[in-house]
Amino acid sequence: MTSQFSPKVSEILAYSREEATRLASRSVGPEHLLLGIIRDRKSNVCDVLRRMAINTDIIKAELEDRVREDNYSQPLITTELVLNDKASNILKLAVLEARVQHTQTVDVEHLLLAMLHDKSDNGAKIVLESNNITYDDALAYLHKTSKP
């Protein structure tokens, strides 16, 4: 694969694992990826969310509630946190998003777009859409912020 992940995406993945550990999850899912993204308040994605008048504290609380509900039925059975199938799929979609945007490096905005573009029901997408964040809107805002 010619695309590679930016250092920021690697940082987000580390944050996501920390969030999964903090919330006693069995694996890292899309919700943890989004928690990792919004943890970096200075990121381009958080700036876009602010421009869209989105309160990231509300998104964080909704994601945490969703993860906690899932954890009641799925007790922690491992100490090795890995990406679950949905999160792995989002990373693959992020690579495709980067290609569509004609960039070689997968960055944080590609993760956000991948979450929103994912055809499966993932908790991150559900929370984003319930807060009126759509793929088309996010893409438009990201294009506005990337222009000089």
Model region roles, listed by residue range:
Residues 1-148:
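Histone-fold recognition with a strong bias for associated Lys/Arg-rich disordered tails
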